[in-house]
Amino acid sequence: MYRRIIMCFRSRATLNSFQRGMCCSTRRYVSSTGSEDDIKNFIIDNTEIVNSQSLTPEISLRLFTPTCRFWTENPEFWPFPDPYWAIYWPGGQALARYLLNNPEVSAGRKVLDLGCGCGASAIAARLSGASCVVANDIDPIAAIATKMNCELNNLAPLPCVTDNMIGSETDGWDLILLGDMFYDEALADGLHQWLQTCTNTHGTQVLIGDPGRAQFEDHNIRRSLHRLAHFQLPDSVKEENYGLTSSAVWRYNCKPDH
């Protein structure tokens, strides 16, 4: 199943809408019927606590590992939407590492982690002294996993919002974090437009983590970015991500960076 998730993530930009639906169409979505305690127990039973072989060994996360059942299990038996939250993606790793290395970036600020996945960037912001952190992911299972990961790191569970916040009002945020969000052209277009509003209208700072996927490198948004940091990925992360060797953090500028 792990390989399927990686390949689905890599290919989504080139799939048509029918094929995208087929990535998940056979799932038995039970997120709305199972209790939160049942879902937590399922996550505990089918993930492993990991705090090594990443760019942020000081953060513990519940993730898929080769010892987990669904690493190799037929994905048709997975009862939820595809578990992107169970993988620590390289863009998110770079973003979390940057925040931990530079705590002044988030200290005392109101932070939104958009598309939070496992919640690592949100956790890094909170550990770095952010006054308020909200995690956002449209997958309600990711929200539960993020709260569990907060507890692993001796933090009170962060507020998690499962609405699609792209296009929403953002005047309350000092800093918006986006890790590995530029995998689909239509999504990237929507993000670009929304981020322009965030920065131009409200002065929100935006940081983006991405390992250099083609969908990101080829998008017009690259002209509006300034690279802040660059990290070599651990060997295990390189292997799991099919040749991606490094990951970077970018600041979104109001005007194109020439």
Curated annotation (Swiss-Prot):
Family per record: Belongs to the methyltransferase superfamily. ETFBKMT family.
Entry keyword annotation includes Transit peptide: yes
Main location: cytoplasm
Domain of life: Eukaryota
Keywords noted in UniProt: Cytoplasm, Methyltransferase, Mitochondrion, Transferase, Transit peptide
InterPro entries membership: Ribosomal_L11_MeTrfase_PrmA, SAM-dependent_MTases_sf
Subcellular location: Cytoplasm; Mitochondrion matrix
Reactions this protein catalyses: L-lysyl-[protein] + 3 S-adenosyl-L-methionine = N(6),N(6),N(6)-trimethyl-L-lysyl-[protein] + 3 S-adenosyl-L-homocysteine + 3 H(+)
BP GO annotations: methylation; negative regulation of fatty acid beta-oxidation using acyl-CoA dehydrogenase
CDD domains to which the protein is assigned, alphabetical: AdoMet_MTases (cd02440)
Protein species of origin: Danio rerio
EC number(s) given by UniProt: 2.1.1.-
GO cellular component, one term: mitochondrial matrix
EC primary class: transferase
Entry function: Protein-lysine methyltransferase that selectively trimethylates the flavoprotein ETFB in mitochondria. Thereby, may negatively regulate the function of ETFB in electron transfer from Acyl-CoA dehydrogenases to the main respiratory chain.
Pfam families: PrmA
Protein name per UniProt: Electron transfer flavoprotein beta subunit lysine methyltransferase
Gene expressing this chain: etfbkmt
Keyword Nucleus attached: no
Molecular function GO terms recorded: protein-lysine N-methyltransferase activity
SUPFAM superfamilies: S-adenosyl-L-methionine-dependent methyltransferases
